């Protein structure tokens, strides 16, 4: 959630005239994150988060805002989109699509405990169940075709060893069979910096703007690779099991998902390794930029490749 498009106090005052939220009291840019422009907004009626969308078109965004509304109304701790006086949740500010959502309690964690991992596992399972009644299907914007199309621009930044690993992983992903796995709407970016923890409870799940319909277990693999991983890329057994046990208690995991577990971690690893590589070497212009190190996900991917049998033992108690 970096600041790429500046918004002045006066511009925000003018924009808020379209809302019934009272007087603007404070406006602060949010430096963390890598894709959209975000500000904390304080008014006479409370605190909100303003997002200016740097990549999505206005036509794409209503599905994401509708999903957030759908989940929030079913008890999932996620931001609730605020509608303006015309009844619209999406507007435009400084030439960019813009939305205002509720500001939730809590803070992101650098070093989550097993209790924190259990809390986010439980919320993710509830989110998957709540999303089953969301009737809109959202298309994946960063699928394998997206990665393959960008291989020529990434090639100069890969040494020979990484280029061989990339070729092998793309071949693996293409052959990876997920037809027996449950599908639905997934968050697809459930990293620690997209979750607010309020004590040992989840205060808020943020940034649904890369959600899409896919294999539910892919969401688990993405989250585990950030919440339950040590600095060297190895999985922390206690945190992994706490996450999976809590998820399983809400939406029971299947034997097919168990068999797919090591492979799904590889698929998640390659996506984020290449996405971070892209964001590092081809950044958007902006005032406050925060790019994440692709080497972190390179390590996670390598460990997932090397530790298949060990990963199969990191599973729920049956």
Curated annotation (Swiss-Prot):
One of its GO terms (biological process) is threonine biosynthetic process. InterPro entries: Aminoglycoside_PTrfase, Homoserine_kinase_II, Kinase-like_dom_sf, Pseudomonas-type_ThrB. Its EC number is 2.7.1.39. The keyword tRNA-binding does not apply. It comes from the Bacteria. NCBIfam families: PRK05231.1, thrB_alt. This is Homoserine kinase. It comes from Methylobacillus glycogenes.
């Amino acid at each position: 959630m970096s600041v790429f498009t500046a918004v002045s106090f006066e511009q925000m005052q003018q924009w808020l005239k379209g809302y019934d939220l009272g007087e603007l009291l404070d406006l602060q840019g949010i430096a963390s994150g890598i894709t959209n422009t975000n500000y904390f907004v304080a008014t006479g009626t409370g605190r909100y988060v303003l997002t200016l969308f740097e990549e999505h078109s206005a036509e794409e965004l209503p599905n994401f805002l509708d999903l957030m509304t759908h989940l929030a109304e079913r008890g999932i701790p996620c931001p609730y989109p605020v509608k303006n006086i015309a009844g619209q949740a999406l507007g435009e500010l400084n030439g960019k699509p813009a939305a205002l959502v509720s500001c939730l309690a809590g803070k992101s964690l650098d070093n989550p405990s097993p209790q924190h991992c259990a809390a986010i596992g439980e919320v993710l399972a509830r989110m998957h169940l709540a999303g089953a009644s969301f009737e809109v299907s959202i298309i994946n914007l960063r699928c394998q075709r997206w990665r393959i199309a960008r291989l020529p621009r990434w090639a100069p930044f890969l040494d020979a060893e990484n280029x061989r690993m990339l070729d092998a992983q793309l071949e693996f992903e293409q052959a990876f069979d997920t037809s027996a796995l449950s599908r639905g709407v997934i968050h697809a970016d459930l990293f620690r910096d997209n979750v607010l923890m309020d004590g040992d409870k989840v205060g808020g799940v943020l940034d649904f703007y890369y959600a899409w319909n896919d294999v539910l277990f892919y969401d688990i693999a993405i989250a585990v690779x950030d919440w339950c991983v040590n600095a060297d890329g190895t999985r922390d057994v206690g945190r992994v099991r706490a996450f999976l046990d809590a998820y399983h208690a809400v939406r029971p995991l299947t034997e097919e998902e168990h068999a797919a577990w090591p492979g799904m971690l590889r698929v998640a690893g390659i996506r984020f390794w290449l996405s971070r590589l892209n964001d590092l070497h081809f950044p958007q212009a902006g005032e406050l930029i925060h790019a994440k190190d692709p080497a972190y996900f390179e390590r996670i991917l390598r460990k997932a490749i090397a530790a298949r049998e060990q990963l199969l033992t990191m599973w729920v108690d049956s």
